[in-house]
Amino acid sequence: MSNPMENPMKKSLLAAGLAVALVSGSALAQMKPETMVKQRQAVMTLQGKYWGPMAGMMQGKVPYDAKIVQRNAGFLDNLSRMPWDGFDGATKDVKSAALPAVFTDTAKFAEAADRLQNEASKLYAVSRSGDEAAVKAQMGAVGKSCGGCHESFRQKN
C-alpha cells in the first residue's frame, strides 16, 4: 500500500486543510460575513467538481474508472469537512442559497453535515477496496446525504 503523503496532490490538499484549520478560529472572528459565504460556496463548488464524474459513473453515463473514483473520493472526504464554519450566524443576512433553517434548526443542520462527512469518509474507504459494486452503493449514500441537506437547507433555483 502506498503512503498517501507520497502523492503531491494529497500533500497540497492536506496542507491547505491544515492551514484552514489553524487559522480558522482567529480568522473567522475577523472575517467578514460575505467572505465566509464565499469560502463555503467555494468549497461546495469543489465538492461538485469532484462529485460530478463519480455521479456520472454511478449512473452509467461515464465509464467506471477506479483511479478517478479513489482520487475524487479522497478530495471529497477532505472537502466534506470544510464548509461548515462558513455557515456562522453572522452570515444569515448575506444573500445566498442557504435557507433560514440553516440558522434556526442548527441541530438538524449539524446532523446533515455530519452525515455527509461520514458518508464521504466511507466512500473514500470503500474506493480503496476496488469493489465497484460497493463503491457505487456508497456513492448512492453520499448522493442521498447531499440531496437531503439541499432539500432542507438550500433554496431551489
Question: Predicted segments — roles?
Answer:
Residues G17, A21:
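Active-site-proximal loop/hinge segments that shape catalytic or ion-binding/gating pockets
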Residues E34-N157:
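Sequence context surrounding c-type heme c attachment/ligation sites in exported
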Residues N3-A15:
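Bacterial N-terminal signal peptides that target proteins for export
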Residues S24-S26:
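N-terminal signal peptide c-region/cleavage motif recognized by signal peptidases
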